Amino acid sequence: MSKLFPNATIRTSAPYRFDIVGSFLRPETLKQARHQCSCGDISCADLTQVEDAEIAKLVEHQKNVGLRAVTDGEFRRTFWHLDFLAALDGVKEVDAEKFSVQFKHDNVRPKTLKIVDKIGFSESHPFVEHYRSLQKMAGETEVKLTIPSPSMLHLICTVRATDYQPIERYKDNNQLLLDDIADAYIDAMNIFYKLGCRNLQLDDTSWGEFCAEDKRKTYTERGLDLNQIAKDYVYMLNKIVAAKPADLAITMHICRGNFRSTWFSAGGYEPIAETLFGHCNVDGFFLEYDSDRAGDFKPLRFIKNQQVVLGLITSKSGELENCDEIIARIKEAAQYVDINQLCLSPQCGFASTEEGNILTEEQQWKKLEFIRSIVEEVWGK
């Protein structure tokens, strides 16, 4: 029973009161193996063996810390998003002069995406085998699959890209592009569902950009209608949710950038709150709330019956927050959303790219133990 909220209860389905965004710091052995593979010193098969061994350790560590659903830490990825998107049918990863967004105080390797054919998803996508492998390692424990939101493909290829030229199929037909992307995700969802997936998280930085005044100004000056783009993205998400099996939970994580503890967007949720929270039918939102860059809780007034996973604990630093302050912020959020619609997690993953954030593995796990202790105090064991 909760010590603070008499009516607070635990949850037995995703998202959980104690949850995570998904990525973890890569162990040095994995970083070394990836470097050796890129240099040709070991084979891809050798790298996979190292990945398998490290993911198996990670899965056990997640179980031991009390997580109800485990991830592979995104250990097989370079980026949180490009690896998945570039392997879609009709998409190609290309070099770029600069990364599509500028992080504060740091630079990312310049890669981007191009749409070269009809968008689709096939069973040859490498994430299918990755999921099978993780499912075996997890055993009876639930697996959580994290992939970039469909919005990200459209954002990178058409909105951020100032030189975007649609292929013939999508010329003067953005609606067809939106539908093809959504249909590809529905195909992916169904394939993963057949493999046992019941917990799917869509990671998304588009909404973080749409919260930022400077980003909104830049896009508007280019003649882009951000309000319509936001509605288009909700359309894609709702088309996917409408096609999902009843026992599959689909959540979305909204991010403002997470590369080596840096960020690229700032601004509260108010500009997107009514469109996203009021109309998007996902089962839950993982929301960054670890700094004043995320604004206050007032935008949560648009939440309907979804779960809101409060990202009150930063993953950008190893320093532990003050427990009383975190509980006070949960109480503040509960003024807008019922306590039984709230959960707690880190603000983002610990390593959205293979470089990872600036903290140690020990600090990473202490963060999760800290979150679990707060969850037990607020919602009970």
Predicted regions: what they are:
Residues 2-381:
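Domain-level signal for soluble alpha/beta catalytic cores
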